[in-house]
Structures are given as structure tokens and as C-alpha cells.
């Protein structure tokens, strides 16, 4: 049960601990910078900071990690909108419409909407975390391998919605992504598949592929055209004030997408990237003008960021109440709590209730700082789009190389990134979208591993596909999502 007296005590504790507030602010700012840099993720930032929290006061150390987590999820949207370079996997969905708005001279609108949506989604997720954590976490525990497979299948069906003008080309790109996702260690047997003898391919190099498809390919195209890296580079960011009319228009979208993000975040293995794409798809499905998506729809930007940041609180739910991390970041945070002598789980709310509620208050503070620091830093980070193309193009390529190399100190990863960049360049020329490839790389391993696990648990029978209500509902929704664009196209042709 929610205890208001502990929340009040948490406020008092935090107000009397300026050091914790300072470290939380530092964490948010560091997270924004890390998220904005291609190849660097919130997971990496949290992992690097983890050893330093051991000698720190518990609240300060844990809030600094929370700040990096929250800021990292949001930071990827900045370069995704301005340069179509997703700083994080979750920002790949934001880039679809965010960059189109930049090309239309509406970069300021897109950035302010992304910042406010990130703040709102994160705040709503923390409120849910405070009030409903025991109930929601126990419900999320019902997701077995079959439900997780169905969720991944639903995620893959979203390819139909993000394929742009050609569904066939989008599906081809998605199949290509699924094939790439099979490279590496078999999820059940542990033996290498399609690695060609390269040890580096034991795990699919997802981040290098994403950087190559989205960033390097754009730089290659710019060099061919011998012009500025983007037409958007000639456009000032403009006002960062979000108009009241726009706020009213996206309010329901933010609320719905935040809820989806919280729900998806609670499911182990489903992170902010999945939440962003699912929120994008659902917003498009509910929209009266779905044809505007992919062409600069502000609701799309709001939905992706609200969903991704709503996932943060959702991922913390099972970690804090059941000791089950929702994603890689919360797994590291679980380690941080253990280092501080606290064992996440049901007993944590009774043994360390005051600490838990102090963290809740600190998380709210982190999101307020994200809103303030996010808006203040946009102009600084956004100045990159004013740099001439003959300077910016080599800078972007250098950033791609450095960011990729920093992942594992591996030149092999750099080679993978450059190959993906060349492939992405030819995909652009042929009209094949890159987003389905990224989505398939995210969802493919999750779908395969959970399907095989569910098949093993059912003794080789496929009855788990239709005997479990949640699994059946998600698979039905996936079929509906996949068929909707086809039905719409047929109806459009009939009208003509």
C-alpha cells in the first residue's frame, strides 16, 4: 500500500541532502549528452558509473544512476530529430517524423514536443511506480515465454505501419533484419550460427548496424550530392516554446503512449526501443490522418518519446518489488542496490521503506531537471545543424567511427558499421526503409528465444498459441496490425 507519511519523509530527506540533488542533476545532464552521442547508450553510462557509487552515500549514488538512465533515454531524440541520427535505439522511431519536421523548418517544435513528452511520460511512469507498484508488478509476472513471444510478434507486425509508401519493400527490409538477427549464438543451444568463424559475431552487433543504417548512410548520400548534410541544416531551430494548441493536440497521445510505455517496461526484456515503436504504431492506428505519419506528424514524435520514457518507471516496477529487472539498465541498478546493502523485492518496502520513497521523490526531481536541462541544452546541441555540410559530413562520419569503436574498442565493429552504412545508402536509393531492419533486429531475438522456450515447455505442442488468453489477444492484434495497411490500400484503390 502507498504510504503518504513515507513520501513526506522522503521529501524532507531529499531537501536536507543537497549533495544528492547535485549528483542527480549531474546524472541527468550526463545522460542527455550520452544519449545524444551515437553509439553511447544509457546502459553504458550506468555501467561505467556503477563502481563509483560503491563509496557514495546511497541516495546520491542511486539518484545519479537514475539521472543517467532517464537522461540517456531522452537524449537520443535530439540528434534523431535534428540529423536523423538516433543516439539510442529508442530514438530510431522518433527520427521517422522528427527529422521530417526539421526539414520543414519546425525543428524547435519537434524538440520542445519531444522534451515535454519525455518529461510527461517519465513523470507518469514514476507516479504509477509509487502508487501501483505491488499490483502492476504481480500482474506483469504472469507473462511467460508464450506471452513474451506474442508481444515480440506484435512488435514485428508494426513493420507494416512504418514501411512508408511500399509495404512490400518494408517487409523485405524487415526480413533482412530478421536474417541478420539470427547471426550469433543460438539462444537455446549456445552454439554459433552464421558467424563465418568470427568470434566478434557471437553477438549481433546491433548498435554498429543501427549507426551505419541511420547515420553513415546519410553522410555517404551527402558526399555524393556534394551539398550540406541536410536541408534542415539551413533552418534555425526557432522557438522552443510549445504552443498551447499543439499541447492540447498531443495531450491524449502522451497519456496513451505513457501508459503503453509503463506496461511494456514491466515486461522483462522489452525496453524503451520496443515501447517507442509500439506507441508510434498505436498512435498511427488511432489517428484520423494516418497518411501524415512519416511525413512530419507531431503526434508521432510525442508518442515515441512518451512511450520510451514511460518505459523507465515500468522497468523499475518488477525490479524494485520482485527483484526482476525489466531491462539491461535496471539489471545494473539492481546491482547498485545490492552494493548498498539493499535486496530488491517485496521485503524492500518494509525493510527500507524510507529509502524507497526518498528514491521516488528523487526520481521526480530528476525528471523536472530533465525538462529544464533539456530545453536549455537544445540550442547548444542544436548548433551542430548550422555547421556547413563540408565540415559536418566528416564530423558525423568521425562521430560514427569513434562512437562505434568505443562500444568494445573493436575495429571489427567499425567495419560492420561502415558496411551497414553502404547497405543503408543503397537502400535509400532503392526506396527501402531502414526502420524495419532496426525493428527486426530488436524483436527478432526476443521472438525466437521465447517461441522456442514456450515450445519446449509445452512439450513440442503449439497449443500455447491459442490456449493462453493474453498470447491469443496479442497475436490477434498483430494480425490486425499487419493486415490494416493492406485493407486500407485495397479500399483506397476501390474508391479510385
State the predicted function of each range.
Residues 112-227, 339-493:
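Membrane-embedded alpha-helical modules
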Residues 59-63, 100-117, 288-300, 328-331, ...:
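Membrane-interface alpha-helices at helix entry/exit sites of multi-pass transporters
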Residues 69-80, 87, 297-322, 326, ...:
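A structural-propensity feature for long, helix-poor, extended segments
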Residues 33-43, 81-91, 124-128, 264-274, ...:
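Short helix-coil transition sites and intra-membrane helix breaks within transmembrane domains
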Residues 28-42, 71-84, 159-164, 258-268, ...:
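Transmembrane alpha-helix interface/packing and boundary motifs in multi-pass membrane proteins
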